């Protein structure tokens, strides 16, 4: 079973959210990076761009496929992980740490409440793979 930290919130699109005040740090789950295989390129938005919840904000290209990235919450991008320019494989090595994607100043912090808990996400991925 993939690593699913308890302190994060999860989307059914396999993104995670870590809340830091009014900021959401967003990345893809261990399950997602495992399904993708070796990541070779990550396309992220620019700081200052705004997104609605569940809107595509970029893509991840792996040796297997290209997958869109979706923001589970709405808001303005305040940071992007510049490390992906030279090291896209950080997504595979540390999806919940150095492999974070973007930081968003949340418009509606309550949106996080509609996301899955770690246990719910584990159940979702099990059901999805059956």
Predicted segments with their positions:
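Gly/Ser/Thr-rich helix-start
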Residues: 38, 59, 66, 76, ...
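A short beta-strand motif that forms part of the nucleic acid-binding face
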Residues: 30, 64, 73
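Conserved hydrophobic positions within beta-strands
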Residues: 14, 60, 69, 74-78
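Acidic, low-complexity mobile loops and tails
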Residues: 1-56, 93-130
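Short, Lys/Arg- and Gly-enriched loop/turn segments at beta-strand edges
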Residues: 59-70, 87-89
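Residue-level recognition of beta-strand microenvironments
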Residues: 17-19, 63, 80-83, 109
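Aromatic- and Lys/Arg-enriched surface recognition patch
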Residues: 78-102
